[in-house]
């Protein structure tokens, strides 16, 4: 039995020129994709079963890290508690994913000082925003 894995799927833009991001939780028992869909001010949370590679719009999947089996429930709770911000004009699916990752740091699911995670987070922060 392998450890659960978190990754971020980066997809072709759905709206405008912003790449779409979603969080992927892979376990031995299920694959869940957490994302927001829509545009300001009508974003909605969506959870689906499947892998990022199930769609042709996937550009790449960034490995965030392995997590402990007890952390599966914590990640699911963090996602459930994550808020959709339909008030802030600049908020989007990329912010949603970054906010969940930061909440996972606060819950000690992810370690901010882990060099691999820090590198992925830096890549995501660099990719944040419109495609140029």
Features from the language model and the residues they span:
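N-terminal accessory segments that precede or flank the first globular/catalytic domain
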Residues: 1-40
């Amino acid at each position: 039995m392998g450890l659960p894995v978190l990754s971020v799927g980066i997809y072709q833009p759905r709206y405008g020129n912003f790449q779409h991001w979603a969080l992927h939780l892979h376990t031995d028992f299920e694959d869940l994709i957490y994302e927001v869909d829509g545009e300001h001010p009508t974003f909605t949370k969506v959870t689906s079963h499947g892998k990022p590679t199930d769609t042709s719009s996937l550009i790449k999947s960034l490995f965030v890290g392995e997590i402990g089996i007890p952390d599966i429930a914590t990640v699911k709770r963090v996602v459930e508690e994550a808020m959709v911000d339909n008030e802030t004009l600049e908020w989007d699916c990329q912010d949603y994913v970054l906010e969940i990752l930061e909440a996972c740091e606060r819950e000690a699911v992810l370690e901010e000082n882990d060099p691999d995670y820090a590198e992925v987070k830096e890549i995501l922060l660099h990719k944040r925003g419109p495609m140029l």
